[in-house]
Amino acid sequence: MSNNTSDLKSFHYLENGEVSFSILDTVKTEQKLDSGVYTLEYLPYPEMRVKLDVSTDRETIKIYTFPDKDKLDNLFDSFFNKNVIQKVKDLGFYHKVGVLLYGKEGTGKSTILKSYAYKVLENHNGLVFYFTSNQYVNKCWEFIKKIRAIQDNPIVVIFEEMDMYVQKTSEVPEGYLKTILDGNNSIDNCIILGATNYIDTIPNAIKDRPSRFKYVLNIEGIHSEEEILDILTPMISDICEKAEIKEYAYMLKGETLDSIKQFAMDKIMCLQSYSKNKKSMGFSPCK
């Protein structure tokens, strides 16, 4: 069975989580790729094939408010609006959009991306593809183009470390990435989501072109006490008094989502937590 991607005709779901594919018509296999979350990796010589795995990273995603949430909500609502889709089609354009999130580590960029991607999966029968390496991006993208040729599900592509794909160590030149975002390698009915901790490393020709990334949004720490309370309360309300949790929420203002979650986990595990640039936040001993 070949994994040549010239003419995809069948997909085989293996017990180890990998999805094998064939150029042959086969009996009792799927002729289209199931809606789901997948990781892509190209295996060089001697295998020389795309490795497609069903992603096991399907943690429960709860998204919290951030300053530009309404902007993203409206963008996704508009993307799936039937009138908008028809208008774009009438104009002869590909229906595609990109969003790039940036900010320091732990601000919840990946959580936000996953939340929107999984909504497309669940509400629109979408296909979500994660790139796992900056090597052989072109090989994996050619595979995605073959998927697009045989089915019309909305496709969401996630680059979690966008800066990695514009480094000199990347096997694929920056120019190829541009053609994916907005060029002869673009595909229809596609949403590209990227995240980076190092926005200054992203070339202006990529981050400042709305046709490549419609929105480039800074995701900061959480400054709303109420929102921090919403995060902490379901996690530690059974082991902390309401007044304690409110005090913790005040002390955690400006911290990242990751730091807040870790604070709660430390409390659950009876560990001492510290906040950067703030006084140490101690706990009463576990009973």
Language-model-detected regions and their locations in the chain:
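Conserved AAA+ ATPase small/helical "lid" subdomain
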Residues: 218-224, 229, 233-287
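AAA+ P-loop ATPase mechanoenzymes
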Residues: 1-91, 95-106, 112, 116, ...
